[in-house]
Amino acid sequence: MKHSVHEDKSDYFSNHTPAGKETRLPEDCVKPTRETCLPEDCVNPTRETCLPKDCVKPLLETRFVKVFDLQYEDGKHYYDATRHSSGDIAATKNEAAFSEMFPDAVSCVVILCLPNREPLLLFSYEYRYTVGRYLLSVPAGLIDPKDKESSTRDEALINTAVRELREETGIEIKSEDKVTVINPCLFSTPGMTDESNALVCAVVHTDNLHELSQKGAVGSEKFDGFALFTKEEAAAVLRNGVDPNGHFYSVYTLAALLYFVADLWK
């Protein structure tokens, strides 16, 4: 745990300012702020700084990815790679819409409970085209529009998780299993994209690991087997910072390892 150290600087300026020296900043050194694209009604004491939709300019639009120029300030450009239309990106949402937004996808922390064995954390090796390798990955998938028709956001996220587990692992969720939402919306890399994932935990009771299957992969999905870790083995992957193949892994794999090792699923 990190502890903040607060230095008492109450006498700093009095002790370091020459006697009689004017310390106030001259008025001619104060420059007016640049005119921005944000209207006054979009900046309030709650720090709501939603971007007006007319300040979002399209640069690239493909089936799966779009890139927009977010013009918060004249002459400055911030680029957002997103799955959303210009009117639905996170930057344009007010506080109410932002707090209720759906993530793009669901990532699953999957823990297998077997008779007379310690629990195991389940991963797959999935090919990730942007890094050109099979990475240690959690089961995950995009939320379908039909999922959003559920009565609550959590229900929609759980429905997505159940479907993805079936497709990517062959696991069928049963009544004795437990599927819960850990976090409804996590940003992956907010410095360049508003892509987001929910994190869902599935505690699955099984007595047959041979039922695991990746035959349900769809589209461009490519898998190369599973990885099962005990708590001790998962902790070793955390300490090493790479998977057993020596490859780095995603932040969602890191989250799954931490959640499992810390026993937060119990």
Predicted segments, located by residue:
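N-terminal leader/linker segments that precede catalytic domains of diphosphate-processing enzymes
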Residues: M1-L135, L142-E167, I171-L212, K231-E232, ...
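Phosphate-/nucleic-acid-contacting segments
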Residues: A217-V237
